[in-house]
């Protein structure tokens, strides 16, 4: 079995995997004032925040190119790849996952699977890493898919944002529109639910209380198993440091990896968002 893993630019990959020849990534466009950008090509994350601050309109994103994925699958076939797993941004907040399922019929020479990751960022990158590791350990394709589904089912993220406008106006928050007029008195905690949608999980009165509540939620989640924990933020270093300190003060003794949301996810969360992601160690 020669396996390739395809993902998208919302996945935060471990440094040692960024040049791995078995990993392929599709760019997701970010549109600001009718100009199209691709992070890492013609847009740095610092430039993104500056352009977002300067613009009168909220940025938008589009889906990766279907034709690019179709062409990539043809290229992989010509290079002798026999199996492909595609792991992309949660189907609950992007239509891309639903739109690509037909491609398996277009490339019958490759055995492929596109499971819904139901997540993004560092937990998505962790899934990509695990799939490659399992493949190189000699696991069968079906065994990899079974184990991957176990990881997907055990993965989630909880988020606190400064401004719900990005999520609601972008159509990425399933049950948040009623909160827009009430943000002065609450600080909503959001989560990725079982369908990969971002939903309001709980309403807390202040940011400080919300941060403490995030720690309580995290400790409850990881009490019954072994998990990798990520603190993820969009230009909110002070909040990330504070959340990490609260975690350590609560007795958490394991490594905590800190990463930044890329431009695509920061488009929907806005500047100042803080989150934690958890994914099981398998």
Swiss-Prot record:
Q: Which species expresses this protein natively?
A: Streptococcus pyogenes serotype M1
Function in brief: May bind long-chain fatty acids, such as palmitate, and may play a role in lipid transport or fatty acid metabolism.
The alphabetized UniProt keywords are:
Lipid-binding
Domain DegV, residue spans: 3-280
Q: Which domain of life is it from?
A: Bacteria
> Which InterPro entries does the record match to this protein?
DegV, DegV_C, DegV_domain_contain
The root-end lineage is: Bacteria, Bacillati, Bacillota, Bacilli, Lactobacillales
Q: Where does hexadecanoate bind?
A: 61, 94
- SUPFAM superfamilies, sorted: DAK1/DegV-like
Q: What is this protein called?
A: DegV domain-containing protein SPy_0865/M5005_Spy0672
Name one molecular function that GO assigns to this entry.
lipid binding
């Amino acid at each position: 079995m020669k396996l390739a893993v395809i993902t998208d630019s919302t996945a935060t990959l471990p440094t040692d995997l960024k040049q791995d020849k078995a990993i392929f990534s599709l760019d997701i466009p970010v549109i600001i004032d009718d100009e199209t950008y691709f992070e890492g090509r013609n847009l740095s994350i610092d430039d993104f925040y500056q352009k977002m601050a300067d613009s009168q309109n909220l940025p938008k994103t589009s889906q990766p190119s279907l034709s690019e994925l179709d062409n990539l699958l043809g290229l992989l076939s010509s290079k002798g790849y026999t199996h492909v797993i595609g792991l992309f941004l949660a189907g609950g907040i992007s239509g891309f996952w639903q739109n690509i399922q037909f491609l398996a019929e277009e490339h019958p020479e490759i055995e492929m699977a596109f499971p819904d990751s139901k997540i993004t960022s560092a937990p998505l990158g962790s899934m990509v890493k695990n799939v490659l590791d399992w493949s190189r350990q000699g696991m069968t394709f079906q065994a990899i898919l079974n184990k991957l589904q176990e990881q997907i089912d055990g993965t989630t993220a909880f988020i606190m944002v400064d401004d719900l406008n990005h999520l609601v106006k972008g159509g990425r928050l399933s049950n948040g529109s009623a909160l827009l007029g009430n943000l002065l008195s609450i600080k909503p905690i959001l989560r990725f639910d079982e369908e990969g949608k971002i939903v309001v999980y709980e309403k807390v009165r202040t940011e400080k209380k919300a941060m403490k509540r995030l720690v309580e939620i995290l400790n409850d989640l990881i009490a019954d198993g072994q998990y990798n924990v990520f603190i993820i933020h969009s230009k909110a270093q002070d909040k990330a440091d504070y959340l990490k300190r609260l975690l350590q003060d609560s007795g958490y003794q394991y490594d905590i990896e800190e990463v930044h949301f890329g431009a695509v996810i920061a488009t929907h969360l806005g500047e100042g968002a803080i989150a934690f992601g958890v994914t099981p160690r398998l």
